[in-house]
Amino acid sequence: MIRKAFVMQVNPDAHEEYQRRHNPIWPELEAVLKSHGAHNYAIYLDKARNLLFATVEIESEERWNAVASTDVCQRWWKYMTDVMPANPDNSPVSSELQG
């Protein structure tokens, strides 16, 4: 397994909405993550700094990267654009952390 860690941001006024939308995530998104080899995916909110710290274990970078091209991921990203900064393709602005 490959362990990944990354940070994202959440809008200061959107903490509760962000948490509501993730509790739970869409079942079809969860299924896509699992079918693409993602395990133990967890996201933690740092309210004081409006940061999200995420960890995930993946089976391969190729399968993990393929999640982004799925319809459900594209819809999820669009759904989240009003609560967190997004790139032009609606993916969340994120920075990968090095271990």
Curated annotation (Swiss-Prot):
Primary subcellular site in the record, as a coarse category: cytoplasm
Pfam families: rhaM (PF05336)
Subcellular location as annotated: Cytoplasm
Annotated pathway: Carbohydrate metabolism; L-rhamnose metabolism
GO biological process terms, semicolon-separated: rhamnose catabolic process
GO molecular function (one): L-rhamnose mutarotase activity
GO cellular component: cytoplasm
Enzymatic reactions: alpha-L-rhamnose = beta-L-rhamnose
UniProt: substrate binding residues: 18, 41, 76-77
Active site per UniProt: 22 (proton donor)
UniProt entry keywords in alphabetical sequence: Carbohydrate metabolism, Cytoplasm, Isomerase, Rhamnose metabolism
UniProt record similarity statement: Belongs to the rhamnose mutarotase family.
SUBUNIT field: Homodimer.
Main function: Involved in the anomeric conversion of L-rhamnose.
Name used for this protein in its record: L-rhamnose mutarotase
Originating species: Shigella boydii serotype 18 (strain CDC 3083-94 / BS512)
Gene encoding the protein: rhaM
